[in-house]
Amino acid sequence: PLAPVVNEQDLQVLPVIAHVGYPQAADEYYQLLLALRPGRVAGLAEIVVNGQPFTVTDATEDELALTAWARILLEGTPIAMDGSWQLHRRRAAPEPVRFAKRFGGEQSNTSIMVGDAIIIKMFRRLEPGDNLDITVHNALNDAGISSVATLYGFMSGQIPAEEHIPVDLAMIIERLPQPRDGWELITAKAVDLVDVTDLVAGLGQCLRTIHEALRHTFSTVEIDGSRVADDMVRRLDAAVVTAPALARYRGTLTARFEKLRGRHLAAQRIHGDFHLGQTLLTPGGWRIIDFEGEPLKPLAERRLPDSRWSDVAGMMRSLSYATSAHARPTAPQTLTWARRASEAFLTGYGWPNTAEQDVLAAYEADKASYEIVYETLNRPTWVDIPLSAIRAMGQD
């Protein structure tokens, strides 16, 4: 257990960390939020405490349990019995807790909606150290950046191991008003090839503002372009094994990678997994969310500075993917729509100079080769979307 049990009437809410061990792999830790009620219910799990049986259920599926838990986090002052569980308040929450419920969409973490103005984002799989999403939101809030949600606070604890490893457990963040999912918005317009240039130009400006703030807040470094090129070539060769269709385009892709050799690339803290699904359009403009980086990468790698053009390339590829909503995603007029959208995004962000264009081109190629592997394994009917982009790269 991470903290004292939260009691409300006969309901008890208990956060715990599950330790999953593997004989030949690193251990993993997962956060669970349990609801306990006295008595037994057929078919449900139970535990016995001091001779008293309790039915155990998933508290994230129980609105009464979630509301009780949210009240403690936002209105109370919980203190762990062993000192391992802490609540860190950064800014005052805007309203008292009236109700809480779990967001029903598919997510890698658990989002709890608290009223109309707050989200508690509970991290399921725990990683030692500071959570990037918390770190970046806090820094951008301090810098006065309005294109991210307000961070009200976060919760931290310790993984129950001999070393008492510190870990972030959840963040309490603003629930943005009237949000429209960026992916759903742009793909809906792609169906009829409706012009989106003004929309995506604004998104480019938003990303540039965030990059500038991150550059001033966190340290910047130079990275070896040859090492970046080596990494891209290595990923491409591994991709060819999974997706043999890539083999004929290896020369096209590596030609882009090779232009990085002998260069020193400016690197900084970036978003790390930037695409339309990480954006929301609100009445106040674009907002960018989820600064945890690519979920499949280890935390240590996600913490490393990278070129800002990696984020730009991610959005360029995402705009290309938006054409999947059209009946003929690879038709000339559809590709023209995607090209104009990408150009507008770049205009909003700030067109790269000649040297930076080569960096952007390399990152685009790297992301497209990854996409072909992903589609080969998961959505074979979509393979032609990144493949058509790679074909076009060969014609540049």
Question: Model-flagged regions — what are they?
Answer:
Residues 1-10:
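Short, Gly/Pro- and small/polar-rich lid/capping loops
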Residues 13-15, 21-233, 284-285, 294-329:
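Conserved ATP-binding subdomain of kinase catalytic cores across diverse folds
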Residues 91-99, 236-270:
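An alpha-helical support segment within catalytic cores of ATP-dependent transferases
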Residues 198, 353-363:
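All-alpha amphipathic helical-bundle segments outside canonical DNA-binding/catalytic cores
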Residues 269, 287-290:
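Pre-DFG segment of protein kinase catalytic domains
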Residues 273:
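Conserved catalytic-loop position in the HRD/HxD motif
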Residues 277-279:
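Hydrophobic residue at the +6 position relative to the catalytic HRD Asp in the kinase catalytic loop
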Residues 293-350, 365-380:
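Active-site activation/catalytic loop segments of kinase-like enzymes and analogous catalytic loops
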